[in-house]
Regions:
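N-terminal trafficking/processing presequences and adjacent post-cleavage segments
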Residues: 1-22
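Intrinsically disordered, low-complexity regulatory segments in eukaryotic proteins
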Residues: 26-33
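Amphipathic, interaction-prone secondary-structure segments
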Residues: 34-71
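A short, surface-exposed interaction/processing loop segment used at functional sites
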Residues: 69-87
Length: 87
């Protein structure tokens, strides 16, 4: 799977995941322009990407494509805190 195809699949999956779980009282549905790629990498036959959205829920979506086994994985994380630690 090429990088472009992989990132398109990731974006579609974030939209599908969010829209199937969002509270209906929020009156929000995600569209393609609400999803962005934070980071991505392709090594040999494998792809990995970290995506997020314009929604202020702190969720990150990590995707991995294992090119050897032709398997796709999605992990969803919640950013709990970001703080500076002085050394």
């Amino acid at each position: 799977m090429g990088t472009k195809e992989f990132l398109e699949w990731c974006t579609e999956e974030v939209i599908r995941y969010f829209n199937s779980r969002v509270d209906k009282t929020d009156n929000k549905t995600l569209k393609e322009e609400d999803v962005f790629v934070v980071w991505n990498c392709k090594t040999l036959k494998n792809n990995k990407a970290l995506l997020s959205t314009t929604v202020s829920d702190g969720l990150y979506y990590e995707f991995t494509f294992n090119g050897n086994s032709e398997e796709l994985y999605m992990e969803v994380y919640k950013k709990w805190e970001n703080r500076c630690i002085n050394l």
